[in-house]
């Protein structure tokens, strides 16, 4: 166990409940899950929650298209999402929904608090209205040219190219996504949260160590142009929570969605007797709170969300970890853009560890985009996992099983080399803590090269099976098995399925404390295939369904 015991809550951004989980969603959940699994291995108390973002016009319209109720739609989608996350071994303690009694209660309670403090203002505005569908258009149902960078085909709330936020009415040449027609401006009233009054607090908070430097710079750009009051209401028809005392007004999804982090934890408290809701969310909490998000929602999490928490005297996040977009052939994979690879399709062709490992090999604590290339993917999995990692175990286990009835020696053939591997754990720990997962993969592969080189130099297959030499053979192969074991301990949070198979093969749990304690005079199982090589033909089959 790590020397200082920590209590941690981790969240991922909430997938929208109008469609399938794609491998872009999975990037974030895998990143968070690796971090969570590592800290659990170190003996910390770690809770991991997320939820479906289950409100909005898009859900209402999707349900209408399917001729089912919105409630039925979000129920079906949540089940599908839970299956997808389970297939990729995402270890949520609670995967909830924003359409819940807890979220209704907390959204109304927080709104009432904001209103009583004079932080909610009602304004008359002009809003884009679809005369064909007779509906006020939400941000994501309007496309046009970004008023800042002039990029075309951008949504009505923020630009995916320059990350600017703006009002839908600021778009140049707006078009309704629903009808394809140009909307008109229509008068309505909306409720606004007084975000500008938190400018000084937010300027101080973003420099408190919670954000990576590039995220700070991005956030500072919004201070330069000045923060604007934030609309938190939407007009009927809408699927969501009604705002008390405001007929035909509903909470905007960006109010009740982040509150979903809190409600998912509140629901978890009902399920677990170990947890106390107020212990985590009070301003003096000794829990750590981390949000994993994509760079397209930085504004909401570094400005709007901390201002809301400050206003209602809830604790602030300890860190907001931002990743880049997932791209293929240079294009962002996005459900809203209609360019995606569904997680359920992926798992029909490849196992979950393969994607987890591939993502880990590219992930850092920076916001750079991650390019997925299927040829590179197959080469990396077959080379790293099959040829290097599993082969190290196989070539040593064959001798241990054949000549020693599965028993490892009572000594290692090279104590100095074993200690060298053990000493690398300190840098691996730093890499995990700082989410530099690509460095963990690189270091593990470097160690594998060292281990395989050691076995190649010793050439156990050439050692004569005499009474004099048989002991040396056992010591060498015991050394090889133990070096494999250390590397698998390092990789356990990344490839949990392979870790389970390895534990079965070794008849020993892979624990962080076990790094310093080699397996000696210990019987292992007969070796069995731990990982299957990926067939190139599978890649071509998969590429066909992705077109």
From Swiss-Prot:
ATP binds at residue 335. Zn(2+) binds at residues 146, 149, 159, 162. It is found in: Cytoplasm. Its EC number is 6.1.1.10. Its cofactor is Zn(2+). GO terms for biological process: methionyl-tRNA aminoacylation. Keywords: Aminoacyl-tRNA synthetase, ATP-binding, Cytoplasm, Ligase, Metal-binding, Nucleotide-binding, Protein biosynthesis, Zinc. A motif ('HIGH' region) lies at residues 15-25. One of its GO terms (cellular component) is cytosol. InterPro entries: aa-tRNA-synth_I_CS, Anticodon_Met, Met-tRNA_ligase_1, Met-tRNA_synth, Methionyl/Leucyl_tRNA_Synth, MetRS_core, MetRS_Zn, Rossmann-like_a/b/a_fold. A motif ('KMSKS' region) lies at residues 332-336. Gene3D superfamilies: HUPs, Isoleucyl-tRNA Synthetase, Domain 1, Methionyl-tRNA synthetase, Zn-domain. It comes from the Bacteria. Binds 1 zinc ion per subunit. It catalyses: tRNA(Met) + L-methionine + ATP = L-methionyl-tRNA(Met) + AMP + diphosphate. It is an enzyme of class 6 (ligase). Signal peptide: none annotated. One of its GO terms (molecular function) is ATP binding. Is required not only for elongation of protein synthesis but also for the initiation of all mRNA translation through initiator tRNA(fMet) aminoacylation. Monomer. Belongs to the class-I aminoacyl-tRNA synthetase family. MetG type 1 subfamily. This is Methionine--tRNA ligase. The lineage of its organism: Bacteria, Pseudomonadati, Pseudomonadota, Gammaproteobacteria, Enterobacterales.
